[in-house]
Amino acid sequence: MSGFDEEVLDTLRPALGGAVGHLGDGTAVFVRHALEGERVRVRINERTAKFARGDALEILSAHPGRVKAPCPHAGLDRCGGCDLQHADEATQVAWKARVASDQLRRLGGVEHEVEVISVGEARGSRSRLRCLVDNEGRLALRRVRRHDPEVLTTCWLLDERAQIAFSTRWPRGAEVEIRALGEGEPFAVVRLPGRPTEIRDLEGRVLHPDTVSRVDLDSHVFTVSPDSFWQSHHLAPEVLSDRVVEAWREAPGARVVDLYSGVGLFAHALERAGASEVVTLESSPSAVRDARENLRGRRGVKVLARRVEPRTLAPVLREGDVVVCDPPRTGLARGVAQALGQAGVARVVYVSCDGATLARDIRALSQVGYVPRSLESFDLFPLTEHLEFVAVLDRG
């Protein structure tokens, strides 16, 4: 690539995507692939009236935590899947803690120094991966700011059992989601515009359309259909369920309303822990079917196929409830925080994979009377800038 300005600068602090420094004219610049306190030669890719974005072309003075990326597809203008391959584990954890603390302060008004809890080994920890297919039928991920994809021969984070998928040829133009959930055989979900979704084994053979994953957790086998959400880190379901149950046990109310409840992961854990009544709300037809299968025979659990929005919450919520919510990356739907406040629920246990939307929603909940009691973060997305959070807020 040519025609871009280049400049040498010192980075000052962590920021999303890398680190931030200042150009010679004083403009703040966000530098991908850089770490705090490094001297770098930067290629400027974008300028706005307030800031610039760039990539670290050369590291002139390195952070002590800088390492060689373990994945052969990492690097400048390469795979956009992982942002922190160039940092050792301790540096990644410190980086994530600083960035998350800053997001909470700026967007949520929460003064909280985030501590990141490491969870197991990174390599092979990922159970799901969504890829595109190039014109030669090869699995690929998008490159940063590039139209041409990065063809993959491996994924360092993906379950070892699924690596064979990168040697298989797939339908051109398809989206392929590799699923290696639980102990069963991994498979791929193949989606092409205008065609029915196919389930294939990782050598490309078409499987029965009713193929599902079976995940053994807490002496219970969960059914997870191809269109249903399941956490991407192998240890995430257990880690998050344990924390949700702990937060429920600390609360004054026994009744639980589980929002964005998916296939029933938290409802199962809460009922098993002794919750006398759990009501779940989920809009995905696939996840609702799975939840009804996974929670069959639980007399205290009621599964509702509903979108999470103020009009559906009003007849469900009661004063004193404990609400558990695990919304998508976009956070709570409009008006949901206000609906929780109007109902007078006693405690909100908020599970989030996005620090920015969590901070926004904590601010909204604070405005209707909720006070943050605890916030924990788990490194369930190693080598990337993402974290999983569990925030607990009580009625003030």
What are these regions (language model features)?
Residues E136, D394-G396:
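Short loop segments at secondary-structure junctions
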Residues M1-C325, T330-Q338:
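Accessory RNA-recognition modules of RNA-modification enzymes
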Residues L304-F389, D394:
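S-adenosylmethionine
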